[in-house]
Amino acid sequence: DYGGKVSGTTSSSGFKGAQSNQLYASESLFEGKIRREKTYTEFTENAIAADMLPLELKACESVAVTYTISIADDEKTVAVAAAKAEKKIENVYADIPALKIATDGSINETALTYFLHNVLRQTEFCARAKNYAGELIGIRDIFQQLECALLWIPDYCRGKIIEALGFIGEDGRAPRQYTYPRSKDVPPKMDLRKFIDQGVWIISTVYTYLAVTGDFSILNETCGYYKLSDDTVAYSDKRDSVLEHLIRIADFLISNLDEETDCLHALYGDWNDALDGLGKTDDKGKDYGTGVSVMATMQLYKNCNELTEILTHEKEYADKIKTYKATAARIEKGLRKYAIDENKDGDKKILHGWGDKRAYKVGCYCDNDGKSRDSATSNAFWVL
């Protein structure tokens, strides 16, 4: 009978009952015990160390189970490491602001408060940890999480911003994902697919950090670069300030503005992975065509205004301020001319983008399959 904690080891298929089963349909969970225990697995299997805890929760109650995992050659070292980790765990979420949400009664206040508290908790967890099953860390994910968490853990986020900026290419291109290098002699692995929007999140996050904290000293912190080519990563000796990193990122993005529409080339894609392919072209000898991401274009417009404001606090950047103001005006003109779709009744909507040579549009009244679609993200960034 299942009356207490069950612990054991098995394989993924042993726990779920079949390799094709999803975790929520695991036979072990339904039976309350590990279905087929194993002390070793084949090379093609995933090893599982599983606990099952019997819990009974009343309304609005919750339980969090935290595991401390230590690896050492002797029990004494494990015990010391575990004690240190337990102490840290107690204080990890101490800075999360206390919330008490009041509503008009249409939404349960307790449920909404509980939900938002867990959103903050998850945000801080993601900002602090490498929250991936694999080794690659998404640079967009890092900066999105930091932009939120800096509201209550600004000092920690400051260090993480500086750290992550050290993985930027010398030309200002940000990788899609990166790993921490195993040693000084071995460069990190990176996902170098040219998603155009990586850098826009970085600039906005640093701007938010400055707006919230007023700590402009971060702009003078020094960090490095990597040499990025199509499929290789190499160390770079170049080092300069956080501010110079932001300028390089912006200049890389601006270099990818389309000459005809003044909007930002999508290249491999943008944040909306479902629309990867807007940058494709059939032209021989070209990796990408003139396809555009309207969402990323508006993010760059926002970046230009953010950098203009940042640079007014710095000396010797008058030319850059002029450049970013002119670029913002150029982008606005292009967006108003090309990014607004109108139907026969005079109704209008914001496009998500278009393909090479504007051969087709996405998020318009008549997409290439004849259907009308709306892009939530491009409309949201038009407002922002």
Where in the sequence are the language-model features?
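Trp/Gly-enriched beta-strand surface patches
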Residues: 1-59
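Short Pro-Gly-centered flexible turn/kink motifs
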Residues: 54-73, 300-303
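Low-complexity, Ser/Thr/Pro/Gly-enriched N-terminal "stalk/linker" regions
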Residues: 75, 84-135, 156-159, 163, ...
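Extended, well-ordered alpha-helical scaffold segments
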Residues: 79-92, 107, 111, 115, ...
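Glycine- and aromatic-rich loop/turn segments at beta-sheet edges
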Residues: 120-132, 170-186, 217-220, 256-285, ...
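Solvent-exposed loop and edge beta-strand segments that line ligand/cofactor-binding
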Residues: 128-142, 185-197, 281-297, 359-384
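Aromatic-rich carbohydrate-recognition surfaces in CAZymes
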Residues: 142, 149-263, 293-297, 301
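Catalytic cores of carbohydrate-active enzymes
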Residues: 175-176, 299-384
